From Swiss-Prot:
Function: Catalyzes the ATP- as well as the pyrophosphate-dependent phosphorylation of a specific serine residue in HPr, a phosphocarrier protein of the phosphoenolpyruvate-dependent sugar phosphotransferase system (PTS). HprK/P also catalyzes the pyrophosphate-producing, inorganic phosphate-dependent dephosphorylation (phosphorolysis) of seryl-phosphorylated HPr (P-Ser-HPr).
Protein name as catalogued: HPr kinase/phosphorylase
Cofactor: Mg(2+)
Protein species of origin: Streptococcus pneumoniae serotype 19F (strain G54)
InterPro entries registered for this protein in UniProt: HPr(Ser)_kin/Pase, Hpr_kin/Pase_C, Hpr_kin/Pase_Hpr_N, P-loop_NTPase, Ser_kin/Pase_Hpr-like_N_sf
Pfam families cross-referenced by the UniProt entry: Hpr_kinase_C, Hpr_kinase_N
Entry's Gene Ontology BP terms: regulation of carbohydrate metabolic process
Family as reported in the entry's similarity comment: Belongs to the HPrK/P family.
Positions bound to Mg(2+): S160, E202
Amino acid sequence: MSVLVKEVIEKLRLDIVYGEPELLEKEINTADITRPGLEMTGYFDYYTPERIQLLGMKEWSYLISMPSNSRYEVLKKMFLPETPAVIVARGLVVPEEMLKAARECKIAILTSRAATSRLSGKLSSYLDSRLAERTSVHGVLMDIYGMGVLIQGDSGIGKSETGLELVKRGHRLVADDRVDIFAKDEITLWGEPAEILKHLIEIRGVGIIDVMSLYGASAVKDSSQVQLAVYLENYDTHKTFDRLGNNAEELEVSGVAIPRIRIPVKTGRNISVVIEAAAMNYRAKEMGFDATRLFDERLTSLIARNEVQNA
């Protein structure tokens, strides 16, 4: 995957100091950013020209302190064909030598009024999410009470119908049928729809529904963190399902594990309400309120009292 320079400009609201249209179509293939330091002294061993070059106050001050001809020579060595763009932070004035080198080497020069550290963080986060490797899973991703819940199950079990019912109950659809999931960092999963399926949901017997057109912009979301997985399966009298919520199960995607619960589907059960309760219960556990632990404590206390009375 790659990101175009013009997409970064639009996302971070950067100003274009120099950049022909074809330069804004350059591809960025790495989320790493370089803040050139030793390179300005002429040391180019281990230089990474394929990264976006970000100049803050320190780099700019050192550059300005150099004689004009030395400044131009250093910048010409820094600006290579594979360099996607150069960004100058804090709204600092771009030296004429930089513009001259950029024109000769065909490198876009961009500026931002944001502080260097803040700009670097936003840029890294954006590139990380855009360039992360995607894993496609079958299911429905919903935003329920601000939590990303991935609904999975066998084909025909009613995942999309459950998603539609949740939309009617005020929750938001992120993706139906195919969910593209990526690891935003070592502990966080993020999910989004395939572009062709965005805001659409397929219901057997009805066809494809445009959720945004029918229910409005508040019924959809472009992406969401994936925090909980729910697996729907047919009710089986010969199978034992978790009744206390103490059998921990996990779903692992891209090396990141999230909790997963299994919900048996049976005629008469309102699955959307059950999933709502599961989402709220998970949030309560994250806040330190565990109903299973509370029940266990009460049961232990009751047994202890009975033993004392019967002694």
